């Protein structure tokens, strides 16, 4: 009899690890966090790691390439985290397409997956410090950029579904849904900002080439995984 862990089960555990860690429903079952990652558990402490304390720009401020540069760099950083997990999953599946025979290796993958939100946060902090931007400036630019790019909640839900299927491989029957909550509030704000006329034509033109890039490489940021200390995802067949 084969002994191991079905890939379907392991992938379900990976999803649980990704979305459950910040809410502390999953992580305590495993070893202590790596020392270099542990400081990124709480948003207040994460914000304190950003050197610049510049305030949110005024209502008259407009997006420029310089303003969106941190968001684009953070999207690349978060995408690199996802790609590493995808690579690890592919390596585990390579020997046998239906069974992970090394349960220990599978559990190591789950442990890695639970670190994704913290690694994304670390990447954002590094980008902001490299570019001398504050968290308040990042929040402003992100909200305005998403509004100007015409990205809606529906777009993000579709992109998230595509990301999970591409990354996790054999979850094609699974549906990934993020409850309304803070994510819904954020997209109601961006929709309202877009509809209000506060975004000018130059900003729409600026973001047009980056819309698909954000949907392809910045899904975790579009879901706000770096910006909240609790995050829920519902996985259903």
Residue spans for each PLM region:
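Short acidic alpha-helix initiation/capping motifs at coil-to-helix transition points
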Residues: 48-49, 115-121, 182-185
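A charged, solvent-exposed segment within the mature domains of Sec-exported extracytoplasmic proteins
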Residues: 131-210
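A cross-kingdom marker for long, charged
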Residues: 21, 192-237
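Positively charged n-region of N-terminal signal peptides that target proteins for export
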Residues: 1-4
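Hydrophobic membrane-insertion alpha-helices, especially the h-region
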Residues: 7-25
